[in-house]
Amino acid sequence: MAWARDEGGAAVLELLVQPRASRTRAVGEHDGRLKIQLAAPPVDGAANAALVEFLAVALGVRRADVALLRGETGRRKTVRVAGITAAAAVAALAS
């Protein structure tokens, strides 16, 4: 998948985030990125916190293993997830 790659022993994910959705879920690829809908609003970092929590649970890693590399205030985000491969991340999120 174009939205996931291995880099330095971790998976790097390119995401497109839609805050204030009806529920939190991964909905598929959009513009070369994995689109994730978040129920949280984009206020005071709530959407970023919800994204980290969603990815940690979905990928079976600790929240501390999920780091936002780029896109703190935008919809297009790059996230690094330690302790998992890109292939495992794709399998967990694309299903």
Curated annotation (Swiss-Prot):
Any Pfam family: DUF167
SUPFAM superfamilies listed in its UniProt record: YggU-like
Cellular component terms per the entry's GO annotation: cytoplasm
PANTHER family hit by this protein: UPF0235 PROTEIN C15ORF40
NCBIfam families: DUF167 family protein
Family per record: Belongs to the UPF0235 family.
The protein's name in its UniProt record: UPF0235 protein AnaeK_1146
Organism: Anaeromyxobacter sp. (strain K)
